[in-house]
Amino acid sequence: MKKLSPKVRNIIVIVLVVAAALSYLYDNYLREPVTVDGEIVIHSIDVGQGDSTLIMAPEGNLLIDAGTGSSEGYLLAYLDSLGIETIDYFILTHPHEDHIGGADAVLENYEVKNIVMTFFTSTSNAYDAVLDALKKNVYINVIECEEGAEYYIGEMKMTLLGPNPDELGDDANNSSIITKVTYGESSLMFTGDAEYVVEARLVSRFRNELDCDFLKLGHHGSSTSSSDVFMDAVTPYLTVISCGEDNSYGHPHREILSMLQKRNIEYYRTDRDGDVVFVCDGEKVYKKGE
């Protein structure tokens, strides 16, 4: 193969540098900002040692996980207090009881239009209860998670970053659905109980697409999640940890709290703060009332 002359190589380098500079200029100064009409409200619901997040958009509702079976009464009362009747998308990140324990009650008490799952093989009673509830409510559109799939509730976009069906292993935590929610210029990330191995895969595949304003910390603030390489890619300024008071796992782990403090990331904890509500106006995310 004929080698390129130094002059040609220099021209190529100059072209690449100019292209990169123009791309940066467009992204940061010339591109029209994405504007939205209204706000979305993010409810990190205190379901004890479990997870449940409700996002209310002007055009509909997204629910991610449904806490434990023992907290389902509280979850339903919370949804009722907000006047929730319809859930447009219901994402079950993975079939552990602390994430899907109240899912069957949600399916039986509200109009759920779409449910997103991974079909990770599970023999738990909570998972069986979800399947039974779906059999009774055949009108619900069941969606199997596919990496890169995008769904919308009005101007709010939900992007699934995995896993693909062929990537489900034997670990439910690391088969968690990863969801990025985008509203205007703002974005939020929800990773279920995904741990380091999944975070590394996300950075490898989506490094330039992971930047978010808000992150629900993975695995209840466990040190098995929120790796440095992942946090470097996501760079959130606001986070929430969903965990139970005096839980037996020691969540959130001290290493995680130290990491958040060193990075100057604002964080809230359901075990201490109870239900935590955030607002996203399409430009920034902030705790309601602040």
Which role does the model predict for each range below?
Residues K2-E290:
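Non-globular, low-confidence helical/coil segments that flank catalytic cores
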